[in-house]
Amino acid sequence: MLSLNQEVHGPKTSEVYGFVGSISIVVATVIFLIWGYVPDKFLESIGIYYYPSKYWAMAMPMYSMVTLLVALVFYIGLNFMSTSKPTSLNTLFDDYSREDVNFLPLMKNGEDRPIDPISDIDITRINDLMFDSHLAK
């Protein structure tokens, strides 16, 4: 029986599952490549008679790639459909936008000015800073 001061040493369950999973993937990949590239006569000579058609050695990766491509196109299209038009003001302002509040609190001589509350920077201010030649320098 373990006391409270003793620790149980050994691998974590997640580490064991990760190791077994990675080894299983390597073994499955090797079996798939052997099945795909070794001639049928050799497989039959070592006693393997039942295996899927060699068509699936090319079809499975191609179906996977096409499925991935269709899912990617669908995902990008769904994102385009769910966003506002570039000319919409909803791309600049929403319910969570915070206007810049300029306030000058009463300060005694020698006191530092407090930090302004957090706010969004107006797009016109950003454009002025980025594209006006006298402000950009």
From Swiss-Prot:
Pathway: Glycolipid biosynthesis; glycosylphosphatidylinositol-anchor biosynthesis. One of its GO terms (cellular component) is membrane. Its main location: membrane. It is a multi-pass membrane protein. Part of the complex catalyzing the transfer of N-acetylglucosamine from UDP-N-acetylglucosamine to phosphatidylinositol, the first step of GPI biosynthesis. This is Phosphatidylinositol N-acetylglucosaminyltransferase subunit P. GO terms for molecular function: phosphatidylinositol N-acetylglucosaminyltransferase activity. It catalyses: a 1,2-diacyl-sn-glycero-3-phospho-(1D-myo-inositol) + UDP-N-acetyl-alpha-D-glucosamine = a 6-(N-acetyl-alpha-D-glucosaminyl)-1-(1,2-diacyl-sn-glycero-3-phospho)-1D-myo-inositol + UDP + H(+).
